[in-house]
Every structure is written in C-alpha cells, then in structure tokens.
Amino acid sequence: MTTTMSETIHVGPVGVTFVLEAEQTGGTLTAFECEVPTAAKVPAPHSHDAFEETIYGLEGTITFTVEGVDHEVGPGQAAFIPRGAVHGFVNRGDEDARFLAVITPGLFGPAYFREVGVVLAAGGPPDLEAIMGVMRRHGLTPA
C-alpha cells in the first residue's frame, strides 16, 4: 500500500503533515511529519496513557524531554516515548528541524492539530483553557 501525504496543518509556526491515518492502517498506527522552526513555541509537556510515540529524526536536531531527561534526535536517530511518560520537545538548534512521529495504536490523528490550530489562530494570547480542553478530548494529559 502506498499513500501520498495529506495537507500540512499549521499549529502556529509548526507544520504537521500526516503520512498515514488510522483508517489506512486498520487503527494499527498513525504517522506524521512535523516541521519545527528554530525557537518555535511547541506543545506544553504532556502524557498519553492510550498510545506510544516513536520519533525518527529527518532534518536538524530536536530535543525531546521525556520524564525530565533530554534526548537529542537528529537525522537517522530515534526516540521512544512510552505510554504515560511526561514529555515535550523544543528546537534549540540554529536550523529548522523535521521528524517523523509514529503513534501506536493509531488513536491520535489530524483532528487534534486542526482544533489546536483554530484556537491559536484566534489571535491574542493563546487560550490555555481551550487548548487544554482540546488536549484532553484527544487523550493527552497536560503536565
């Protein structure tokens, strides 16, 4: 089975493009590319109890903090985030970073990013309560 990537969803300056959605994998996994500009504001630390996340670096270097420990992920490197682990990420480098995220099982998809993107596009300071509500609806627990 081959697929083409869907449209890029913008969540602030971060771009998310799904490679595989749950409907294409029988719910086994979802996979998306994430483009993170230097010093971009990224998601608050969070956890998810229903799925794991595997990260594979494509370009630049992204720092994932998992349970308080930093993991630098560059091209060809990977990191695994188990269920329940508090984590977040930041691009501390001087170039944009891009990584592939694989979610298993495929319980997390584009709807989350679209909803957060709408909240952020409203203008003004981000509505943190609204963002946390979106996170909870999609199985993420803010830390």
Region annotations inferred by a language model:
Residues 8-9, 68-86:
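Short acidic-glycine-tyrosine-enriched beta hairpin
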Residues 33-37, 47-65, 102-103:
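Short, conserved beta-strand element in jelly-roll/cupin
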Residues 9-45, 51-52:
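A short glycine-rich, His/Asp/Glu-containing loop-to-beta-strand
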Residues 114-143:
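Acidic/histidine-enriched, glycine/proline-rich intrinsically disordered or flexible terminal extensions
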